[in-house]
Amino acid sequence: ERFDCGIMVSASHNPYYDNGIKCFNHNGEKMEEELLLEVEKYMDGLTDLDLVTGDHIGEYFEWEDGLEIYMSWLKECVPVDLSGMKILCDLANGSATSTAVETLDSLGATVEAISNSPNGININNKCGSTHPEALQRMMREGDYDIGLAFDGDADRLIMVNSDGELCDGDYILYICSRYMKS
């Protein structure tokens, strides 16, 4: 809304020590490949860098309305009524911990979360979309309609049905296309 670009430091679906950088354009979309290559070339050319630490790193600010605006946008993208649904979410101790439960709850679902206590080093650690075993077990043992497993930065999702079976991306696309057709 008010920014020309954005940068996310993320391990995505990797361990915390494999952080990388994701760049976004002014629309919040992934930056165009041509521009990314230009940025990478510029960064590769920097050889005489002084590393900074502590108070010298930079400026931190919190965009107070950012989370609310983002969650409203998510609900606009998929305006569904989830009333009566019981959803179990594996949040991978990642970024979905601040949005998933509240967003799904506001759409009417009853939501329970696991891997919902990030501490900076437990992201994706034997949980989330790369390790859905606990979610699968809880789906078989519990009374849930659907299980959702995110990766650390919540840009990947796998689903688990009430029998604990994984639903791959093809099946998720099938569900989405049926919904859009109806």
What are these regions (language model features)?
Residues 8-12, 90, 149-151:
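Short beta-strand segments
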Residues 4-7, 22, 86, 110-112, ...:
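Structural motif
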Residues 11-12, 28, 36, 116-117, ...:
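Short, ordered loop/turn segments at secondary-structure junctions
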Residues 4, 18, 26, 92, ...:
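Short glycine/serine/threonine-biased micro-segments
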